Amino acid sequence: NVITSTTYLLKNFPEAKVILKEVDTRSHFKFRALPTIKKYVSTDQLTHIFEESEEKFFHKTRILNDLLVASDTSIVYNHDVDVVLPKDSYELAYDAIKTGKSDVVYPFGAGVYQWAVNYSEPTFNQFLDSDFDFSTLDDAKFRVASSIGWGQMIKRDTEVEVGMWNENFISWGAEDCEFYFRLSSFGRKVGRVIGDIYHFEHGRTFNSHYHNPKFMDNHNLWQEIRTWDADKLIEYYQKQDYNAKRLEELSC
């Protein structure tokens, strides 16, 4: 999946800076993914950050904040590695932010706009070899609900101003809901592109499942936060150690 999404972005948006963060005991991307990506596209605009770690929990919120600190553009896209969108959806989202219509855009529809793709190796090869012809996925895709996961395009300053990603959410569960809620509570202009998103099916560890050990902690934190008004949210985020640390990193 990371081969597909990274190659797709570099191919369709050759001037965009793509930053990828990998946290593992050793780098799989460098030796397994990167050589394949280089067969299809230039990687001059790709930055790969590797962090060696024995941590068993996928700390998505921390990684997203790491990526924000590493970025240097006025607009960023928090992009999951297992999805791609039609090219014009990215362009519509970018234009909405550049023209001031939105502070953040979810560039896919809410409802039944997800194409879940049974992504076998033959389908993978056909999609890349066809220069990303979406019709090659027709026999492998089926409709599933879509809401607010998978990422958003956002003004970098807006992400900082609202407190960035809440690093108290660890592993999977509720962090996307909380971020959307917070953007709305702080009065930011949240836009939407009504279009499809292609989600490539993959194996799941406990980090992507309701049974992960952190799921209830995340759920309980979200149930508490969702009852707060904007003033309470501001007070909470101003007291977070991670937020102070990130603001210091951003000022360096």
Predicted segments, located by residue:
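Short beta-strand/loop segment that forms part of the nucleotide-sugar
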Residues: E15-S27, I49-S53
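Active-site-proximal specificity loops/subdomain of glycosyltransferases
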Residues: F29-A70
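Short, Asp-centered acidic motifs that coordinate Mg2+ and/or phosphate
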Residues: I75, D103-V104, V190
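Conserved catalytic core of nucleotide-sugar-dependent glycosyltransferases
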Residues: L68, P86-E167
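Short, well-formed alpha-helical segments that are part of the catalytic scaffolds
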Residues: N1-K11
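Conserved glycosyltransferase catalytic-site signature
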Residues: K60-N65, D82-V83, Y90, S147-Q152, ...
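C-terminal catalytic/acceptor-binding lobe
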Residues: S146, N168-C252
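Short beta-strand-to-loop acidic/aromatic patch adjacent to the donor-nucleotide binding site
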Residues: T73-P86
